[in-house]
Amino acid sequence: MTEEIRELIEKFALQNAVKYRSAPNHGAVMGKLMGERPDLRPRAREIAPLITSVLNEIERMSPEQWESRLREMAPELIEEISARKEPAKGLQPLEGAEGGVVMRFAPNPNGPPTLGSARGIIINSEYVKMYGGKFILRFDDTDPVNKRPMIEAYDWYIEDCKWLGAEPHEIVAASQRVEKYYEVAEELIRRGGAYVCLCEQTAFKALKDAAMPCPHRDQTVDENMALWNKMLDGSFQEGEAVLRVKTDIKHKDPAMRDWAGFRIVTKSHPLVGERYRVWPLLDFESAVEDHLLGVTHILRGKDLIDSERRQRYLYDHMGWVYPRVLHWGRVKIFQFGAFSTSKLRKAIEAGEYSGWDDPRLPTVRAMRRRGITAEALRKFMIDLGVGETDISISMDSIYAENRRIVDPIANRRFFVWDPVEIEIKGEVPEVAEAPLHPTIDRGTRRIRAGGRLLLCKEDVAGLAPGSRIRLKDLCNIEIKEIFPLRAELIDLSPETAKRLKLRIIHWAPVEGIPVRVLGPDKTDTGIGEHGISDELDRIVQFERYGFVRIDSVGEEVVAYFAHR
C-alpha cells in the first residue's frame, strides 16, 4: 500500500515539476493526491513525510530527467499539461489608439528601476510598439527635498530601459524645464485659476477642512502676479508663500480643495543646482508635461485617482483635453514584501546591502546581475497585462519564464558546495568527458578526474558502507568507508548504473577552482570544474544546484544565483 501511495506521489510531484519547471510544491502535491484519493485524507499526517522524502529525491533531478521519468511513469499526465488551456494573457486593445499613441513612463530618479518600474517601462513601450508613436522617459524630479534625485539614477533608468527592450524615443528631465511651468503658472493666474496664498500651513488646513476660502483667494490678477514675482525673486522664504490652483472649495473631499501647485525650496538640486527656488509639486508638473509632450494615454496606479481629479481642474482652467487614463492595481511580490526606494537607499547607505545590485533586492540591476533575462521580464509583465485588481505574485513565476529561456542556451557545469573528499580505489579515468548540454548537441567538456574527488556533504550524508552510486559522466563506485570517505571502482558503464538503478550524483576535481555563489537567501562556497572560468558573464546551470550568472573570474569564481 505504501509503495502504491509513493508511486502516486512521485507522479503528481513530477507533473507539478514539469508544469512549472521548478522544484515541486509540497502543498500542491498533497492537494492533488487528496483530490484523486479522498480515502487517504484521514492519513494526511502520515503521508506528509512521505511526500517530503519523494520531493527531496526529485529536487536532485534535472528538468530533463523530470520529463523523461514522467513520460515513463504516466504519459497521460504530460498530455494533461499540454491540453490545459491557458487563460487570456497579454495587453488588451487601447481605446482611441488608432493612428498612434504617445505614452510616457515618469519615475522619480531617487534610485534605480525596481520590478515595479519595469512593469511601467515595459507596458508603456509595448503599447507604443503595438500602435506606433512615441515612448517618452520623463524624470519627474522636481522634489529636491523629500524625494531627492540621485544623479546616477538618471543613467541607470536609461540603461535599464534599453536593456528591457524599451529604448525611449525622447528623454525629458522636468527639473530642466521649470521655466515652462512658470509660463503656465502665470497664464493660470491671468485666467483667474490660481492665487498666491500666504497663510501658515496649519491655518490653511483649518480653513480647507471647514470648506472655507482663505483670505487670499479673491486677490486680483495683478496682486497675485506681484506676489508670484516676489516668490521668484527671493522676497519670501520657504513656507511663507505657495501658489494654489483654484478648485471647488466646497468639494466633499478636502484633498481636492485648492491644492498647492508651487512652493519655495532653497535646497540645491542634484541636476540643476540652485538655478530655481520655486518648484512645482508633482501634480502640477506632471499635468503640464503630459499636455506639452502630447501624451495620449496614461497608465497609472489606481491609488493615483485623486491626482487625476486634481489635475483635471488645471486642464479645465487652461482649456486643455485630458489624456485617456488606464488604472492598474498594485502588484505585490511575495519574496520582497513592501518596500520603498527611499528605505532601500537608507539601508544601502547603512551597509545592510552591498549596493543597488545586491541579489536580495527587487531592482532591475539586481535581476540582471543574477541572470534574469530582459526577455523573461518582458514576457512576464506583458502577460500580466493591465487590470485594476491588486495582485500578489511570486518570483517563481518570473523564474519559470526565465528558465524556459535560459535552459536551452545554458552550458552545464559541476559545482560542489560544502565539499568532502573521497578516495576511490581502482583505475578511475584522469579526465571525464561530459556533455555541455543534456539534450542539445553542443559538444563536450573535459573535466579533470582521477582517484581523489570531491562530493557534496549533503550527498555524503546519505551514504553508508556498501552504498553504490554513479558519479555523473564518470564511473560507478561502491562505498567502503565513511570516515575517511573511501570507495572502490565498480566500472565505467552507464548501463550498469541503469541496471542497478544507481543514484547519480555530481562531483568536482580536488584541484578544481574555488567558487562562491551569492544568492537572495544565502552564500554557498565550494569547488567547481575549471571550465567554469570560461563562462564569464554567461548564464550556466550548476548541475543539481541551479542556474547562475558568472559575475567574475579570478583566484575564485563569483557567481550570482538566479533560480533552480
Swiss-Prot record:
- Functional summary from the UniProt entry: Catalyzes the attachment of glutamate to tRNA(Glu) in a two-step reaction: glutamate is first activated by ATP to form Glu-AMP and then transferred to the acceptor end of tRNA(Glu).
Q: Which NCBIfam families match?
A: gltX_arch, PRK04156.1
Pfam families associated with the record: tRNA-synt_1c, tRNA-synt_1c_C, tRNA-synt_1c_C2
Kindly report, in one word, the top-level EC class recorded for this enzyme: ligase
Task: Name the encoding gene, please.
Answer: gltX
Catalysed reaction(s) here are:
tRNA(Glu) + L-glutamate + ATP = L-glutamyl-tRNA(Glu) + AMP + diphosphate
Q: Which species is this record about?
A: Methanothrix thermoacetophila (strain DSM 6194 / JCM 14653 / NBRC 101360 / PT) (Methanosaeta thermophila)
- Enumerate the subcellular locations listed in this protein's record, separating them with semicolons: Cytoplasm
One biological-process term from Gene Ontology? glutamyl-tRNA aminoacylation
**Per its record, how is this protein called by name?**
Glutamate--tRNA ligase
Task: Give this protein's Gene Ontology molecular function annotations.
Answer: ATP binding; glutamate-tRNA ligase activity
List, alphabetically, the GO terms of the cellular component aspect.
Answer: cytosol
Family matches, as InterPro entries: Gln/Glu-tRNA_Ligase, Glu-tRNA-synth_arc/euk, Glu/Gln-tRNA-synth, Glu/Gln-tRNA-synth_Ib_cat-dom, Glu/Gln-tRNA-synth_Ib_codon-bd, Rbsml_bL25/Gln-tRNA_synth_N, Ribosomal_bL25/Gln-tRNA_synth, Rossmann-like_a/b/a_fold
